[in-house]
C-alpha cells in the first residue's frame, strides 16, 4: 500500500489520496523533530504560550470550514463537530494560557533544618523531547490537538499519527500549526495504518500518547516496551449511568439518550450500561422510548444523530445486538442499517452474560437494566474490566457523591453526562483496563514532562557528618541524633538524653540557622510544594 484513499462515510465521496509514510521517512522526521525540540525547550513557558496563542484566532476564524471537514471525515453532525471537537480545544488553550507557566514552574521543596542546614532543594520540569501522538477516528480533531497542544506547551516536539479513516482532519491540523511561529519540524505527521504506527514507535520517540481501543493499546504498549519508551494510554470504557428512584426522571431520560447516542455512540465515555432503580424502571423506560422516537437520525448536518464512521465498528454493533436478542433481550426495534446510518436501539431484559453488557460496543445501542438498591447498583457498575467514566442521577447530592466514591472509575459526574470530559481543569483518564495517564488539568500538562530533583549544598565546611571515616562513637552519636529528631516525647526530654550526640554534631553546623535564613531568598524565587 503506497497511498490511502480518504472516503467520506456520509456518501462515499473521495476526499483525497494520501501517501503512506515509509520507515526511512519517519526516521528522518524524527531526526528533524529532535532538532526542533532542542530549540523549543529552551524557550520560557511564557514564550511557548505566546507562540501557540494565535491558534485560538485561527480556530475561531475558520469554524465552518473546520466543522465541515470533520463532518465529511467522520459523519457526525455539525453541532457535534463544533461542541465535541473545536470547543474543547479552545477551552484547553485558554486554560493553559493562564496556568501553564505556573504549573511548569520550578518548585522549592522543604529540607530538614537538622540534616540539610545549608541546603536548598528543588524540582524542575523537563520535556521528554519528541512525543508521538497516535489519535483515533471518533474525535480526530479534539483527541489529536489536545495532547499535541499540551505536549508543545510542556516543551516537546510532536509527531502526529492520525487515524487512516480521518486523514483530511490530520492534514487540517498540521496546516493550522504551520501558520504559527514555531521551529521548523516541531509539528509533523505520519500517514498510514497500524503498521505505520508501529514503525513510528520503532523510530524511538521519547514518549507515546495513544488514544484508542484496548486491543490496539496493548499492541502499542508491547511495541514501546521493546525499546523501552514510556507510554500513556487512553483506552475504552463500558461506562455506566445509575438512575436512582429520587432522580429527576425527565432530565435523566433526556441525558441517557444524549449520553448513549451522541456521535452515534462513538464516544469513549458514552453511556453503554444504564441501570435504573426498580421502583421507577417502568416509568423511566417509557420516557426513554418516547424520547428515542423523536431523534433525527441520518445525513442531515443539523440532525441529532449522524452516521457511523467505521464499517468495521458497525459490524461489532450488529454482533452485540444479535447476541442480546438471541439471549432473550427485548428491543425498541430492529437494528436498521442503511450504509453507515445505524438507527439507535434501546434494549431491556438484559443481563451481564451478554456481550452488550460486557464488551465495549462503541455504537448506538443502549441496554437498560433494573437494580433493587444502592449496593446492587454499585456491584453492577463495578462488574467490568474497564473503568473510565460514570454518572449518578439523584436529587440527593450528598448520597450521589457518596456512591460516586465507591465506583471503580477515573471520572464521574452527578446529574450530567459526557460534559465532565470537556472540563479543561479536570484530569481525564481511566483505571483498570481503560488505561493510565491523564490529560487536561495540571496533571495532564505535567504528564508531558518529567521531574528532575536537585539539591544544592552551600556549606563551607570541609566535610559532612555522614562522610568517611566511620567510627563506633560516630555510630552512637548518629543514634542519639536520630532519637532527638524523630523521638515522640518532648524536645526537652530528647535533648537531655542526647546531649553528647548533639554536642558532637555542633562542629558540622547542624544548627547553623544563619545559613538557613540565607537560603530563604532562593526559596522565594520558586513555588513551594508544601
From Swiss-Prot:
If researchers knock out this gene, what phenotype do they report? Answer: Cells lacking this gene produce 4,4'-diapolycopene dialdehyde in addition to the 4,4'-diapophytoene precursor.
Question: InterPro entries, from UniProt?
Answer: Ald_DH/histidinol_DH (IPR016161), Ald_DH_C (IPR016163), Ald_DH_CS_GLU (IPR029510), Ald_DH_N (IPR016162), Aldehyde_DH_dom (IPR015590), Aldehyde_DH_NAD(P) (IPR012394)
Pathway(s) it belongs to: Carotenoid biosynthesis
Query: CDD domains per the record?
Result: ALDH_DDALDH
Q: Which GO terms describe its molecular function?
A: oxidoreductase activity, acting on the aldehyde or oxo group of donors, NAD or NADP as acceptor
Q: Please write the reaction equations for the catalytic activity of this protein.
A: all-trans-4,4'-diapolycopen-4-al + A + H2O = all-trans-4,4'-diapolycopen-4-oate + AH2 + H(+); all-trans-4,4'-diapolycopene-4,4'-dial + 2 A + 2 H2O = all-trans-4,4'-diapolycopene-4,4'-dioate + 2 AH2 + 2 H(+)
Q: What is its EC number?
A: 1.2.99.10
What are the catalytic residues? Answer: 234, 268
Mind telling me which Pfam families this protein's record contains? Aldedh
Provide the alphabetized UniProt keywords: Carotenoid biosynthesis, Oxidoreductase
Q: Which GO terms describe its biological process?
A: aldehyde metabolic process; carotenoid biosynthetic process
Tell me its family.
Belongs to the aldehyde dehydrogenase family.
Free-text function comment from the UniProt entry: Involved in the biosynthesis of C30 carotenoids. Catalyzes the oxidation of 4,4'-diapolycopene-4,4'-dial to yield 4,4'-diapolycopene-4,4'-dioic acid. Also able to catalyze the oxidation of 4,4'-diapolycopen-4-al to yield 4,4'-diapolycopen-4-oic acid.
Designated name of the protein: 4,4'-diapolycopene aldehyde oxidase
User: In the record, what lineage is assigned to the organism producing the protein?
Assistant: Bacteria, Pseudomonadati, Pseudomonadota, Gammaproteobacteria, Methylococcales
Q: Which gene encodes it?
A: ald
